[in-house]
């Protein structure tokens, strides 16, 4: 526990092209070794691919994908009486977006397309259509929470 109190949460600046804080957070999750220009060019290229393939506004497709990827429930391990229980808990809004972005980027990196912008674009479009690995991960997390519903009364 920190002695000097909690550190204030820094708010990210909105993205200059799409004017969206969620897009900035996605760029930050894509970024490796501080190469933000490279991450943003990958994202904008991916959004261009989404625009070409769907004909819709890429930010709207991305927000739809995020709504399909963000988890509502998750399980937390808690030790009670010498045994560990997986207790389902509701996910806080900020953690929901963080997990959604993390899963979207990590499963995009695991795809087999040739370039990262293609991988990211296809993962976002799949997530918007309620398919894809990131949505499957969310379903798995929800299934775990549902399976351990009997332990919900333990509360964190």
Swiss-Prot record:
Disulfide bond entries: none
Top-level taxon in the UniProt lineage: Bacteria
InterPro entries assigned to the protein according to its UniProt record, in alphabetical order: Ribosomal_uS7 (IPR000235), Ribosomal_uS7_bac/org-type (IPR005717), Ribosomal_uS7_CS (IPR020606), Ribosomal_uS7_dom (IPR023798), Ribosomal_uS7_dom_sf (IPR036823)
Alphabetical list of SUPFAM superfamilies matching this protein: Ribosomal protein S7
Coiled coil stretches, renumbered: none
Alphabetical UniProt keywords: Ribonucleoprotein, Ribosomal protein, RNA-binding, rRNA-binding, tRNA-binding
MF term (GO), any: structural constituent of ribosome
CC terms in the record's Gene Ontology section: small ribosomal subunit
Any one Gene Ontology BP term: translation
Keyword tRNA-binding: yes
Subunit structure and binding partners: Part of the 30S ribosomal subunit. Contacts proteins S9 and S11.
Function per UniProt: One of the primary rRNA binding proteins, it binds directly to 16S rRNA where it nucleates assembly of the head domain of the 30S subunit. Is located at the subunit interface close to the decoding center, probably blocks exit of the E-site tRNA.
Family according to the record: Belongs to the universal ribosomal protein uS7 family.
Protein name according to UniProt: Small ribosomal subunit protein uS7
Species per Swiss-Prot/TrEMBL record: Lactobacillus gasseri (strain ATCC 33323 / DSM 20243 / BCRC 14619 / CIP 102991 / JCM 1131 / KCTC 3163 / NCIMB 11718 / NCTC 13722 / AM63)
Gene: rpsG
């Amino acid at each position: 526990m920190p002695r000097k109190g909690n550190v204030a949460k820094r708010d990210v600046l909105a993205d200059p092209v799409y004017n969206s804080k969620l897009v900035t957070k996605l760029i930050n999750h894509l970024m490796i070794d501080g190469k933000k220009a490279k991450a943003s060019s990958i994202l904008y290229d991916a959004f261009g691919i989404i625009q070409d393939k769907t004909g819709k506004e890429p930010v709207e497709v991305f927000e739809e994908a995020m709504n399909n990827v963000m988890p509502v429930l998750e399980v937390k391990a808690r030790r009670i009486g010498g045994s560990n229980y997986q207790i389902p808990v509701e996910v806080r809004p900020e953690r929901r977006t963080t997990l959604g972005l993390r899963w979207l980027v990590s499963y995009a990196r695991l795809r087999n397309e040739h370039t990262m912008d293609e991988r990211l674009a296809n993962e976002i479009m799949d997530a918007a259509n309620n398919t894809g690995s990131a949505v499957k991960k969310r379903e798995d997390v929800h299934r775990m929470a549902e399976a351990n519903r009997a332990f919900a009364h333990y509360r964190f």
